């Protein structure tokens, strides 16, 4: 009995001695990690000029060599109620939570998949039909091949699906109309392919809606519960959630988005469309109406510090502190460039050619990867310079420039701040 106890203690000590302890973020001055502070702080005036010109808000955080060297907020979390400018707008702070839009794809769906791949619970070469029953071609489909689609095809955005079927808008979706999650899965199965799988890359929300359903099939848990309990909670993240208003957060903690719901200032209409200023609800139509606020392609809210931790996980090769989610081989697998298009990894966008300059600028390394979000969010992770940048914004919280010409262009979207690459270059240009 005594021998068993001693052996157990020795084994425990031995395992703990070899346990991986990953770097955690600490704060440092820019000069301590190779920045010219004066150059870096020139951003302050430029961003403030953009706020004065009408850009709603920008939250910026910069990581270098495991240190947070810049974290600041500019502008307003909420400045409009409908078309009316508030007499007392709510200032954005470094704790303000933002609708991540398509960055959800990376920091919910991809993180979940990377974890499941590392644990051996899924292989990217598995067929989609292994996890979604009856995922196959429909009678009358002109382009065939759904039953042969693999998860890697979905991740590479080469599966053949359209970019945006607009399931909740009956006027556009037609027979594919859906405003309930269970129906949406059936409509996705019925969605016809638009091109022969593997013939080209078309960035598609449908791809990540499918991946969200696959994660739920494997884990037997809703996507939000899985990522919140197995990823965010172990990492100590307290402001990264789906449906924040249902989970203890209040509107003043969150940046508002579109002024008149999803109507683009009154030119778009469909059943149950929201018309009030969106504040604490996901902006994305498919995520809100068709998926109940939780989807693999959109719906996640977070702040810059929580996203910084997740970016540091990637820089660390899969862990943070004493938490290991996956390993460096998994990171390499998911961020490796697609042979067909160097700007795509497995979900991640990669700085593979000049077409990514508006996103990553001209100074980031070619190995840089990350993603953008329609609401005004960017994440950029540079393993060569051991550096990461997160920009969170609420770009749609401004009037539509010309609703009848293009309802998807907001006044703020015409400002230079809407081009992330310029900000990224100013940060890199501040390195000594």
Swiss-Prot record:
Q: How does it sit in the membrane?
A: Single-pass membrane protein
Under catalytic activity, the entry for this protein gives: Preferential cleavage: (Ac)2-L-Lys-D-Ala-|-D-Ala. Also transpeptidation of peptidyl-alanyl moieties that are N-acyl substituents of D-alanine
Tell me where in or outside the cell this protein is found.
Cell inner membrane
Q: Which SUPFAM superfamilies match?
A: beta-lactamase/transpeptidase-like
| Molecular function GO labels | serine-type D-Ala-D-Ala carboxypeptidase activity
Q: What is an annotated GO biological process for this record, any one?
A: proteolysis
Pfam families recorded: Beta-lactamase
Transmembrane ranges, per UniProt, are: 7-25
Catalytic activity, EC? 3.4.16.4
| Entry-linked Gene3D superfamilies | DD-peptidase/beta-lactamase superfamily
Instruction: Please give an example of a GO cellular component term from this record.
Output: plasma membrane
State the UniProt keywords alphabetically. Answer: Carboxypeptidase, Cell inner membrane, Cell membrane, Hydrolase, Membrane, Protease, Transmembrane, Transmembrane helix
Recorded family membership: Belongs to the peptidase S12 family. YfeW subfamily.
Q: Report what the protein is called.
A: Putative D-alanyl-D-alanine carboxypeptidase
Organism of origin is Salmonella agona (strain SL483)
Task: Give the gene that encodes this protein.
Answer: yfeW
